Amino acid sequence: MDQAELARIFQMFDRNGDGKITKQELNDSLENLGIYIPDKDLVQMIEKIDLNGDGYVDIEEFGGLYQTIMEERDEEEDMREAFNVFDQNRDGFITVEELRSVLASLGLKQGRTLEDCKRMISKVDVDGDGMVNFKEFKQMMKGGGFAALGSNL
């Protein structure tokens, strides 16, 4: 994102145009977007963003916040793409058969048998349905992925 676009977004939050976003301006802007945050949480949010400690969010501080939001969104998109590689029928779950198929196509020795794949899935299957949903997949990927799960089979 270029600086001009960031400045436009900042100006939408900076209602009075004084170059800084107050707690009230942040609250009003978020509410206009349909986001309602309790007052104490808003204070904490500003304290995290407010690097110079003046009690306001200026354009530089806002840029850091916006960058963090965008990076998290990009990571989520990457994670979704990876999940979709395994979720071959696009039903929102990775089954034992789908896992075995993908691992085999990658030429990995982990997961050659259905039993291996069942064990791998059971290590991350929080809800016990025998499949991996997107939330479970994200948790697993943060721990090293399916290959890490298979290393101690």
UniProtKB/Swiss-Prot annotation:
Keywords: Calcium, Metal-binding, Repeat. It holds the Pfam family EF-hand_7. Ca(2+) 2 binds at residues 50, 52, 54, 56, 61. Residues 1-36, 37-72, 74-109, 112-147 form the EF-hand domain. InterPro entries: EF-hand-dom_pair, EF_Hand_1_Ca_BS, EF_hand_dom, EF_hand_pair_protein_CML-like. GO terms for molecular function: calcium ion binding. Ca(2+) 4 binds at residues 125, 127, 129, 131, 136. One of its GO terms (cellular component) is peroxisome. Ca(2+) 1 binds at residues 14, 16, 18, 20, 25. The keyword Iron does not apply. Ca(2+) 3 binds at residues 87, 89, 91, 98. Belongs to the calmodulin family. Potential calcium sensor. This is Calmodulin-like protein 3. It comes from Arabidopsis thaliana (Mouse-ear cress). The lineage of its organism: Eukaryota, Viridiplantae, Streptophyta, Embryophyta, Tracheophyta.
